[in-house]
Amino acid sequence: NPTNYNPYTNPENLIHRRNFLLYNMWQQGVISEEDYRNAAAQPLVLAEDTSKKNTSSVTSYFTDALFNEVVGDIMEKEGVDEATAQNMLYTGGYTIEATVNPKMQTAMENLMLNTDDAYFPAGWHEEEVTSISDDDVQVMNEDGTPKTRTGEDGTVYYYRNVRTQAAMVTLDYDGNVLAMVGGLGKKTKSLSLNRAYSVTRQTGSTIKPIGAYALGIEYGLVNWSTMLNNSPLYLKQDMVIRDEDYCRKNGLMGMSDTQLKAYPNAWRSWPRNYGGNYGDNSDLPLWNGLARSLNTIAIRVGDLVGASNIFNFVYNTLQLDTLDPSSDVGLAQMVMGSQTHGVTPTALAAAFQIFYDGQYTTPHLYTRVLDRDGNIYLENNSTSYQALTPQTAYVMNRLLKNVLYSNVGTASGRYPNSNGMESFGKTGTASDEKDLWFVGGTPYYVTAVWWGYDAPYDMTNTLSKNQAKTRTCVTAWKAYMEEVQKDLPYKPFPAADGVVERAYCTQSGLLAGPSCPSRATGYYRADDLPDTCNYSHSSGVTQAAQPAADQTTIPADTSGLDTD
């Protein structure tokens, strides 16, 4: 109990604890016997004003995560429990070589202060809890008494006002975590909840490129211009997907699928696109479906690849091991992102490393830990390997560029202006706007941004539909990248040998033939080119939406383009 060591109420306990630690330091050779006896004889001196000292001693989110990572590695190395490992770290005289970039950490902390809600709008709602802490904003009745509810079992429930939170983390392409902030506003406690490092959330559509699309390209099942139908994979009359709202309202939830076949209205088409539409039954090139984050297109790619193949890749190769092997091996989880627990922002950012050159490296917060004599005590246990071929990685890089640079992209025009450097990204929205994401990459860094409530809650209940958008996460990422990259020299993404640009027919998706009146340019693996189109086309062809050009201007109005 920390109250036992309150220096104002129990100073004798604190002196005893201090002297016990000093004795251990002497016994372990950290200090001499003379130093121990001199220090143990000193009285306890309390400062009159400790507020500034307490504030300055609050550790950053990065330091908190670093502490936990090193403690975990000591536990594994020495075979000791957590308390022993913590004591070893406190008293062992170790030097930790951290991966943090101080300038980037400071810039991220300043942005995540979110002064005047500059980046993340404040949404508040009442949350029912069984106890209230000193940090909670308790809901009171008009007469000044706490708002409560008593359950049937006698449990008293209280209410607190909670606001939207956010997290951000940046890595380089060697897995080094460079900056991390796990909450909005000023940090007031050390080792507080770190939403960037230790909290899992549903991924929404951010899982589409690292799973279905990447493997579809890797396996040669689809390419840049593969034409896919913008319609549900399953129709209502197929009786595959239950309409749970209908079943719930009509008392059918307990029925088996066989019994439910007698109720045609108990089924629905699936999936829907963001906003509730089922598509227009048109054929669209793959790049367009990814840029617009159309569920109807992604689910067809995922169906070709297979949910189990996607799960095995993201779980084992990309180390998203907080996914659930018993409940997440399905298209809804692996393509739509509605997982049981989800993943942390740090793990998701690490997964997007593969769109640089195909390499994956385990994210880590330190390189080495040295003992007091300068000997290596720990080295980070990260692993690095080729998760995708460089060719697939580069095609995916170009595809994800369209999210930011194409007029139809879900984050159209919101790329950072950093000395002409390119970027890629993917938006993501979990069901009912409970989790909003953006993961973005530049030639230097990859960053994940999450926004939502700590306890998942539909953000449109407290913010307008126009406010609860992924563009909030994109805008924060854009501002942060422009700050940390402003003095960096121009750097391109590494182009892969074996990837070629080719003109394709916008009607067939095949390489453009002499009779194709409408063409666009795509990126293809040289060993997996489409056939050449030899169709006979009608003369009245409308120009199709175009992918991002090498130099793209920002659309005049992008306010209505968020679709995911």
Residue positions per predicted region:
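Non-catalytic, structured segments within soluble enzyme domains
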Residues: 1-106, 110, 178, 320-321, ...
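Glycine-rich, acidic and aromatic/proline-enriched surface loops and short helix-turn segments
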Residues: 1, 68-76, 170-186, 217-221, ...
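Primarily short, surface-exposed interaction patches in extracytoplasmic proteins
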Residues: 311, 316-345
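Surface-exposed intrinsically disordered loops and tails
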Residues: 126-158, 237-280, 324, 458-468
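Extracytoplasmic/secreted proteins, especially bacterial periplasmic and envelope-associated proteins
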Residues: 13-26, 38, 57, 61, ...
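Conserved catalytic neighborhood of penicillin-recognizing serine enzymes
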Residues: 52-55, 221-310, 331, 372-402
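Second-shell loop/turn segments in exported
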Residues: 2-12, 21-22, 26, 48-56, ...
